[in-house]
């Protein structure tokens, strides 16, 4: 999926769209997506000016956005139809290495279970094959419009 198709499945826009490309997707099972981390990201102005590191909460958000794409595509729904995926929880979050400008963040999510619009995913974010973050992410699909 290129950025144009991603924008059909995620309501997020600059500066909060954190998925640049999807390279693999198996509906109801797994997704592999990428975030290219650039020094031009607005959060690097304050986190930290002399040692820029991507905030951990934004790594979690990037993984959650990949989960949202997988969920939306699996159930064949779109934000344009009035649906949204909320990040409602995260468990067992661990950060293993910093993510810095120039890194390409690989986002992997696997469905643990999904029932009545509540989804749980096992997620990993890696840089050059090295684990940066892992978490279980819970999302809720809701009709908002």
From Swiss-Prot:
This is 3-hydroxyacyl-[acyl-carrier-protein] dehydratase FabZ. Belongs to the thioester dehydratase family. FabZ subfamily. Its main location: cytoplasm. It is an enzyme of class 4 (lyase). The gene is fabZ. Keywords: Cytoplasm, Lipid A biosynthesis, Lipid biosynthesis, Lipid metabolism, Lyase. NCBIfam families: fabZ, PRK00006.1. Its EC number is 4.2.1.59. Gene3D superfamilies: Hotdog Thioesterase (3.10.129.10). The active site is at residue 47. It catalyses: a (3R)-hydroxyacyl-[ACP] = a (2E)-enoyl-[ACP] + H2O. Involved in unsaturated fatty acids biosynthesis. Catalyzes the dehydration of short chain beta-hydroxyacyl-ACPs and long chain saturated and unsaturated beta-hydroxyacyl-ACPs. The keyword Transcription regulation does not apply. GO terms for molecular function: (3R)-hydroxyacyl-[acyl-carrier-protein] dehydratase activity. GO terms for biological process: fatty acid biosynthetic process; lipid A biosynthetic process. GO terms for cellular component: cytoplasm; membrane.
């Amino acid at each position: 999926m290129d950025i144009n198709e991603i924008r059909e499945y995620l309501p997020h826009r600059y500066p909060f769209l954190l998925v640049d490309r999807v390279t693999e997707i198996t509906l109801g099972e797994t997704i592999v997506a990428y975030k290219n981390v650039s020094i031009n990201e607005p959060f690097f102005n304050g986190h930290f000016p002399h040692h820029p590191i991507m905030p951990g909460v934004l790594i979690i958000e990037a993984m959650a956005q990949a989960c949202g794409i997988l969920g939306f595509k699996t159930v064949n729904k779109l934000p344009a139809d009035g649906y949204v995926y909320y990040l409602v929880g995260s468990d067992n979050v661990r950060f293993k290495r910093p993510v810095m400008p120039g890194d390409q963040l690989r986002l992997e999510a696997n469905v643990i279970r999904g029932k009545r619009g509540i989804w749980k995913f096992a997620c990993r974010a890696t840089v050059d094959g090295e684990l940066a973050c892992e978490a279980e992410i819970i999302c809720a699909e809701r009709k908002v419009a």
